[in-house]
Amino acid sequence: GGDIAINDSPYRRHQVFDIPSQAFSVVEHQLHQGQCCQCSKTVKATLPDNVNQGQMGNNLLAYVAMQSGQFHQSISKIQQQLEQNFGLSFSRGAISEAQGRVSAVLTPAYQDIKETMHNEAVVHCDETRHQRGNENRWMWQVCTAELSCFMTHFSRGAWAAKKLLGDNPENIVVTDQYAGYHYIDSDHRQLCWAHILRNMNALAESWGTNKTYGTTLVRLIRILFRLQHRYESNALSEKRYLDRMEKLRIAWREQLELASRRCVTPRYQNRCKLLLKHDDMCWVFLSHDGVPLTNNEAERSLRSYVLWRKGSYGVWSHRGELFRQRILTIVETCRKQKLNPLNWLRAILEATLNKTSYPLLDDFKAACQ
């Protein structure tokens, strides 16, 4: 019942977050016309240069693009979201057109990342199926730990790989054993040991002599990974690491030669012969620092497109293909560098509309610091 002395600082803070029920604004531009009193010529006002010609502003354009590229929504789902969450009614054609407009302004950012990739010491490359209408096409990707660049192409052959990587790559390219990469010089191509392990596991799970040699080859690959992990964690000196790797390489080749002759299945014999033929490509990491043993980086980056592909109906035009490869390049690069792709896209749209300096990746990173 006595007086209460209230402390200056609160003992508890309770915050409630909410979003506005009306989350959009409309700016109407009224254009007038008039007639010349002397020649009767009609003169019509035009929109200012810094006003979007379409019905969507920069924030809405960026939102629509991110719903596709980052959150893998189909056009129908985006249409439903705009209606349900914001009360905005746009046709599927208008949403598709908005994606095309975003794609057009992303060209400089996309080309900048693609050119930067050619200067990286080590890159990863992989491809996956892509659908355009009723045609089966391919989504290619080259990436590093900090960059990703996607490209759609009708071919899965060397022609497409050259378009993405260049005719004579000077960097080290980590790939699987696919023949489309055979044009790359053996000194600049590292085969993925995870793919090799997968193939050898299949051999070990077979029967007869297949199982015998497959089990031995799998054991050698696991020793390879253990040695690499110990070396990277500084538990093994460089000299001991190289000595053990050299012995392992000799044992690996001996077992492959035996398996290529004695496996009971021609399929596995040929697989072992192919590894013998490409033996130099398996060991490039020994002569170049920083070359990983696997192509897991590319497979992780491609997963974003695989998820998008599963939840949508593909594309039906060249414009749709360009949008996918460019928006995925922006989104995946931002993910790897912990940047906000929505903010970068807004900055690009704003700079394009106002004809100011275009923010490339390095410019946007500098602005975020």
Predicted segments, located by residue:
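Short Cys/His-rich metal-coordination motifs, predominantly Zn2+-binding knuckles/fingers
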Residues: 1-3, 22, 37-41
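Catalytic center-proximal scaffold of phosphoryl-transfer enzymes
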Residues: 28-35, 40-369
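Short linear motifs in intrinsically disordered/low-complexity regions
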Residues: 4, 8, 19, 355, ...
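Short Cys/His-rich Zn2+-coordinating modules
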Residues: 12-24
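Short Cys/His-rich "knuckle" micro-motifs
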Residues: 2-11, 45-49
